[in-house]
Regions:
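Short E/K-rich amphipathic alpha-helical oligomerization segments
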Residues: 22-56
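Amphipathic alpha-helical coiled-coil segments
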Residues: 24, 53-83
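N-terminal functional modules and adjacent low-complexity/disordered segments of proteins
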Residues: 1, 8, 23, 33, ...
């Protein structure tokens, strides 16, 4: 494999990890926001709606964390190779 190809793969993996990391950070912020909305819910109807949004944001957060972990693992595996 050419050095330029390996460099391109490395850059792609670094970019993918950075995007995944930012996505996870945003998901954490969204979950925190939803928790605040739930805590401030004025009545039962608002609390139920806030709970639904919180559950969805937690699912998104967990998916983003898994993506970031996979991207980081792939980057570390690639960097550990001896070419």
């Amino acid at each position: 494999m050419k050095i330029s190809t390996l460099e391109m793969i490395h850059e792609t993996l670094k970019n993918e990890y950075e995007m995944a990391r930012v996505s996870y950070a945003n998901a954490l912020k969204e979950t925190a926001h939803c928790e605040g909305v739930l805590a401030d819910a004025a009545d039962e109807k608002a609390a139920v709606e806030a709970e639904k949004k919180l559950d969805a944001s937690k699912k998104g957060r967990d998916e983003a964390r898994a993506w970031a972990t996979r991207a980081q693992d792939a980057l570390h595996d690639f960097e550990a190779q001896e070419f």
